[in-house]
From Swiss-Prot:
GO terms for molecular function: DNA-directed DNA polymerase activity. Initiation for plasmid R6K DNA replication. Keywords: DNA replication, Plasmid. Changing residue 162 to S: In mutants COP21 and TRCOP21. Belongs to the initiator RepB protein family. Disulfide bonds: none annotated. Homodimer. This is PI protein. InterPro entries: Initiator_Rep_WH1, WH-like_DNA-bd_sf, WH_DNA-bd_sf. One of its GO terms (biological process) is DNA replication initiation. It comes from Escherichia coli.
Length: 305
């Protein structure tokens, strides 16, 4: 049985947000990310956000759009609301000064703090009997989600249904990264990025006891197999991005330091409305041979439990 979507959306409905919000969104757990995207969907990004506007998100809409069961949608709505309510966006440097001018905050280039944390949600309420969640964005977050078009600020555009259906953190973050480049440079279907910067975009890192960043997957073949190839497979399966590929762009000695990503965005042939059957990666013969040998040498880790 198909669930009926009550929201005024379709498979080409877009959500938009300024690029400064990307890192925060990439860090959000899946339930919080889905709640955030559902709240962004009805916003007219060309216009200012109406003061006092409250957004209502129905579990049945989330289930239908994300292609998950109603029971899971109910759980994620409640869990995601709590997580999103505790989430913040952190700004540094010029981003603080720019926001200070927009919102009349008491900061200038001379007295700017090192970091500024902003709450995303002013309040959030869950009504379990009726199966919906209500929330209100803070005033400080409004410049990042409304009045975007026609201004010099760069923003990222994603398809709502595609962003909701990606279930892996790495898939979601890589999809957002590709859409950022596509949104800002529509005539370019590629971008070059360092491996370290890519891991930061994908949140593939932790911090040591001294607060220093430690990147995950130091061995590139494992990063390629367990992160990039799997993320690309899900993106091609569930989004409007019909092709994603990457090649080594630069090395430092024998170490791979930069990658070149190429992609094709085809919003007219959105693949997210296909049935969710098992899917396989389309690998070149060379990649397939490499991965076969590599898997025999370094078997993938099995899930515990």
């Amino acid at each position: 049985m198909r669930l009926k979507v009550m929201m005024d959306v379709n498979k080409k409905t877009k959500i938009r947000h300024r690029n400064e919000l990307n890192h925060t969104l990439a860090q959000l757990p899946l339930p919080a990310k889905r709640v955030m995207y559902m709240a962004l969907a009805p916003i007219d990004s060309k216009e200012p956000l109406e003061r006092g506007r409250v957004f209502k998100i129905r579990a049945e809409d989330l289930a239908a759009l994300a292609k998950i069961t109603p029971s899971l949608a109910y759980r994620q709505l409640k869990e995601g609301g709590k997580l999103l309510g505790a989430s913040k966006i952190s700004l540094r440097g010029d981003d603080i000064i720019a926001l200070a001018k927009e919102l009349n905050l008491p900061f200038t280039a001379k007295n700017s703090p090192e970091e500024l944390d902003l709450n995303i949600i002013e309040w959030i309420a869950y009504s379990p009997d009726e199966g919906y969640l209500s929330l209100k964005f803070t005033r400080t977050i409004e410049p990042y989600i409304s009045s975007l078009i026609g201004k010099k600020n760069k923003f990222t555009t994603q398809l709502l249904t595609a962003s909701l259906r990606l279930s892996s953190q790495y898939s979601s973050s890589l999809y957002q990264l590709i859409r950022k480049h596509y949104s800002n440079f529509k005539k370019k279907n590629y971008f070059i990025i360092s491996v370290d910067e890519l891991k930061e975009e994908l949140i593939a890192y932790t911090f040591d006891k001294d607060g220093n960043i430690e990147y995950k997957y130091p061995d590139f073949p494992i990063f390629k197999r367990d992160v990039l190839n799997k993320a690309i497979a899900e993106i091609k399966k569930k989004t409007e991005i019909s092709f994603v590929g990457f090649t080594v762009h630069e090395k430092e000695g024998r170490k791979i330091s930069k990658l070149k990503f190429e992609f094709v965005v085809d919003e007219d042939e959105f693949s997210g409305d296909k049935d969710d059957e098992a899917f396989f990666m389309n690998l070149s013969e060379a990649d397939a041979a490499f991965l076969k040998v590599f898997d025999e040498t370094v078997p993938p880790k099995k899930a515990k439990g």
